[in-house]
UniProtKB/Swiss-Prot annotation:
InterPro entries xrefs: Smg
Family: Belongs to the Smg family.
HAMAP family linked to this entry: Smg
The organism's place on the tree of life at top rank: Bacteria
Coiled coil: none
Entry protein name: Protein Smg homolog
Amino acid sequence: MKENVLDVLMYLFQNYMDSEVESQPTKESLEVELTEAGFHHAEIGKAFDWLEGLALLQQSEPRRFPVTNSSIRIFTLHEKEKLDTECRGFLLFLEQVGVLDSMTRELIIDRVMALEAEDFDLEHLKWVILMVLSHQPGQEAAYAWMEDLVFDEVSDLLH
């Protein structure tokens, strides 16, 4: 099984983060379950690090930059290597329609860049966006919109 950190994160998201379970499992019990599901210890550790990084970024004091409607995000060469034109266009679209604000966009880009995935595509980006929005207070409508988009596409693939 060729899995990466994103596969572990998607597994956790689908089974735990998106559920209304009252008692959350411990990190140790999750590690055991993920190992039994076939994930490698190294990838499990990296996934937990990724989630801890997300939590730290969300707890830190947000830096507010003056942003106008005519502002354009310039991507670095490294970001362009990870996020192809389709991914960058999708982020721009989400920002233009009001699903993302500039702070959330930057948080998403940071979390994408923290992944070691070599073949990162639009479907992966949608999952990262969904995971980030699920942890953002006040982003319930944006999360619901992305959840519909991601899970409608998944169910279309299954039928």
